[in-house]
Amino acid sequence: MRKISKNSPPALLTTYKKQIGASYDDIDKNVYDATLLALLNEQGWVCGYCQQNISKPQNATIEHYCEKSICNGTGGTLDLRLDYKNMMAVCPGKATNDTHCDEKKSKFNPSSGLPIDISPWNTAHIKAIRYTNSGTIKSSIVRHDLEIDKILNLNVSYLKKNRKAKFVSLLKAAGEISSKKGKDKLKRILNDELVIGNNRYPSSFPGMCEYMLKYTK
């Protein structure tokens, strides 16, 4: 995960919310598409949870951080179903038989851990995240570590494998990082990974790349 800085909602969504009887379930396609595009642009076209690259809008969906079934204005809850600040773009959540991100999260309910507490919009939450050279993502906050592992399933085998491959390849490309020359080279490589061109990161896992900058100090 990486810190997401929220922008203003797209004008189409703002206008739609003002309509009498506006609801997310009946949202117009053009409003949905504009909202998804805005979310992808502010996230650099990577999934808000696992940070995999998203190549096109058809490979993404809008995720409600606090579920529509929970934050729906009933039982004393806020109605966040059309709140842009409660939305993010996510990947399909599956490439194997096992699911992750919002696909895995949808299997849970208020009695089994929802809504989650770890937030990609909270700087302190993101700073508590660390990555290992095995591709594992962890948090020093116990509850968040459980959410990462169980509810979001971000350590599913293929994600770990892909993170490990990138982690190792970046270090290998830098050479000997115990030297200043190696550290400087790694820093340049990582900074290139964090450059957003045309609203897009060049590849997956920018959050891990940002974390790896610690090896350059």
Where are these regions (language model features)?
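A structural signal for short, well-ordered beta-strand segments and their strand-loop junctions
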Residues: 46-49, 61, 89-90, 128-131, ...
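Short, charged surface segments at domain edges that flank catalytic/cofactor-binding sites
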Residues: 2-49, 71-82
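C-terminal, charged low-complexity interaction regions
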Residues: 143-217
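Histidine-centered nuclease catalytic patch
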Residues: 52-109
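Secretory pathway export signals and precursors
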Residues: 43-46, 87, 97, 205
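Conserved, surface-exposed functional patches that form binding/active-site neighborhoods
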Residues: 102-177
